[in-house]
Amino acid sequence: MAVKRFYETFHPDHYDLYIDVDRAARSFSGTSTIHGEIQEETVLVHQKYMTISKVTVDGKEVPFTFGDDFEGIKIEAGKTGEAVIAIDYSAPLTDTMMGIYPSYYQVDGVKKELIGTQFETTFAREAFPCVDEPEAKATFSLALKFDEHEGETVLANMPEDRVENGVHYFKETVRMSSYLVAFAFGEMRSLTTHTKSGVLIGVYSTQAHTEKELTFSLDIAKRAIEFYEDFYQTPYPLPQSLQLALPDFSAGAMENWGLVTYREAYLLLDPDNTTLEMKKLVATVVTHELAHQWFGDLVTMEWWDNLWLNESFANMMEYLSVDHLEPNWHIWEMFQTSEAAAALTRDATDGVQSVHVEVNDPAEIDALFDGAIVYAKGSRMLVMVRSLLGDEALRKGLKRYFDKHKFGNAAGDDLWDALSTATDLNIGEIMHTWLDQPGYPVVNAFVEDGHLKLTQKQFFIGEGKEVGRKWEIPLNANFKAPKIMSDVELDLGDYQALRAEAGHALRLNVGNNSHFIVKYDQTLMDDIMKEAKDLDPVSQLQLLQDLRLLAEGKQASYADVVPVLELFKNSESHIVNDALYTTADKLRQFAPAGSEADKNLRALYNDLSKDQVARLGWLPKAGESDEDIQTRPYVLSASLYGRNADSEKQAHEIYVEYADKLAELSADIRPYVLINEVENYGSSELTDKLIGLYQATSDPSFKMDLEAAIVKSKDEGELKKIVSWFKNAEIVKPQDLRGWFSGVLSNPAGEQLAWDWIRDEWAWLEKTVGGDMEFATFITVISRVFKTKERYDEYNAFFTDKESNMLLNREIKMDRKVIANRVDLIASEQADVNAAVAAALQK
């Protein structure tokens, strides 16, 4: 049953917000004065964790009650029509990284804090009483007071208007949703510039960071705003776009209009020592959030079931914009290794959500943020649309969309209607089959009676219920074929004639931009494999990708995949190496640690990587290509897994040389040097040294490298010490806990310790990060590691009674299937796969 929307009772038009924060008392108080139109005499207004002292309607005090089963109050307004509702309240500062909360950091060993906000999805109600629903757009005037110290900076969605009696007044916002309101204050460092159209661009951090760490993202943000204004043909509507890095932040970033907030790792980097991959990551996060300033902020989904409208489009636009800003990066290749891979794996599990999901109960909202579906799959859908339309038609349709819906709300069909005006294709009809249905098809391509035929059927990894789903599939063939496959079966005609006309092996989904995989019969596959080494990198990646997925779904055997790896071991493309080692890594599940199969698999890794390591060496070279720079990490990691003695020796020698200056070690190789040192030369002293550096450094990339190494310890005593840090926020921040937990759990020597910890500390974990939309991914992490019947049974014993939690329900059920499939796959394939690996070593 649908839960009543508060917007049905009251339409806010403008908020006058007064908020007084007392950091010393860990609390705040204020008045939320809401101008709007009362729709029903009993008005519902959201609040959470608040003490409400008084409510007035048009200056007259009225009765109110707290909801028993919802986060809000019922106000007996006694009237309908235009009114002003004023609510006096107080509330605590939280330590959940939601609502208004402190972030903690150190400068020269001195502990400091910065106050910031996070209101998406439903946390504005923790900061001020409001109608906390996306459709309830209004303007906001913020007056902010706090226990201010000299030298502190205050930021909000809009520029500051004036300061009177210690109160900071900010200019009125444009119409926007409550979840986009933001403010922050504390000691900050900043850099600013202006776009060609005059928009103020700023990057802000704590003073733990140097000015040079802000330069890269400032440049990206400036050029991104300029690009979007041109591409959307719609001006950026605010006078400022400020980017703020918060030391504690639950998500990756948040698109608050005019004041975008980020996890430090996704905004700040040292331009003198960072990887190209990290530059790409920061650039795509910044451009993703700035794409939201139009898609999400200017035009907002009516309700959370259209979350994809915000996230999927921003996810596509981050790549489109970075490709324009830095064409030499070939950023669409990163789309193939991250978005495509994530979506195709997740979307093959029965029970997965569709991109567009009906959601009625607000308690279900945070469960919608499935990164592999709403972000990755959704963006693949929009890449399909872009491919069908072309950029000019896309821009024309988007301008129409923004012109019609700016400062308002929209649903998916509004976008399809706008885009369809720019083409003769029925975009909505095509896209509904992808957005409203979970899963995706495998297209079987085969020669029968001399004809090339295609069939489509939903693809599953593990058990799946076939319900006859059908998709409108853009075939993207490299031969004469229909643009769209609408039917379950398709006869394309005489195979030999098609082959002769094409002059090359016949393939589907060229470019890997449509959301399906292909299973070729032996005739077609043999033809493709003859040309495999001459295919472009994306096609080679796709070949490995589809073989891996088919093997996971038991429509092919991993034993047959093993010989294919050899074909690509000397590829100089980093995305092919990504696909190669992603596929090879899947073979690890069949080789128990310390077994003969494990020994053979490591030897195979050494064979696959040794020529590349010899070609590239450990140390980056002046003038080497971006491809070589990005390929080196894959082959070094593979070489170390393969226990190549020369690689282990070189890595140790590099560590010794940089032992007293590890921060200066090239970021391109630093994680592998550190991991090698911990795995092969580990000690309590080394662990203590690395965790000391972890706590002392403010460089997010260096922190990640140190964490990746520390969790690789093979010593049970050291691992127990590491696990003991999980609840110590002075060492492991809650925002980073999942990464630490995942690292120890993925370590065979630490798996039991981490599994015991999460079961023992579940109540604490839920209290600490349970309100985070990414809380469910702790379960995802577990499903990626477990592979035995015993672990499957333990998983069920622990998680079954937690299915009543709406945030966790789908994840628990899906990951149960993921583990069950892995257990079944290992049982049926292990002997054949390990035999194939052994055979590959004899060649």
Swiss-Prot record:
Which keywords does this chain's UniProt record carry? Aminopeptidase, Cytoplasm, Hydrolase, Metal-binding, Metalloprotease, Protease, Zinc
Top-level class of the enzyme under EC nomenclature = hydrolase
PROSITE patterns referenced in this protein's UniProt entry, alphabetically = ZINC_PROTEASE
Localization in the cell: Cytoplasm
Q: What is its EC number?
A: 3.4.11.2
Instruction: Spell out the Pfam families in the cross-references.
Output: ERAP1_C (PF11838), Peptidase_M1 (PF01433), Peptidase_M1_N (PF17900)
GO BP, sorted A to Z: peptide catabolic process; proteolysis
| Keyword Repeat tagged | no
GO CC terms: cytoplasm; extracellular space; membrane
The residues annotated as site (Transition state stabilizer) are: 375
InterPro entries membership = Aminopeptidase_N-like_N, Aminopeptidase_N-like_N_sf, ERAP1-like_C_dom, M1_APN-typ, Peptidase_M1, Peptidase_M1_aminopeptidases, Peptidase_M1_dom, Peptidase_M4/M1_CTD_sf
**What residues bind substrate, as annotated?**
120, 252-256
| Chain ranges passing through the membrane | none
Enumerate the catalysed reactions. Release of an N-terminal amino acid, Xaa-|-Yaa- from a peptide, amide or arylamide. Xaa is preferably Ala, but may be most amino acids including Pro (slow action). When a terminal hydrophobic residue is followed by a prolyl residue, the two may be released as an intact Xaa-Pro dipeptide
Gene Ontology molecular function terms on file: alanyl aminopeptidase activity; metalloaminopeptidase activity; peptide binding; zinc ion binding
Subunit and partners: Monomer.
What is known about what this protein does? Aminopeptidase with broad substrate specificity to several peptides.
Q: Which family does it belong to?
A: Belongs to the peptidase M1 family.
Official protein name in the record: Aminopeptidase N
* Organism of provenance: Lactobacillus delbrueckii subsp. lactis
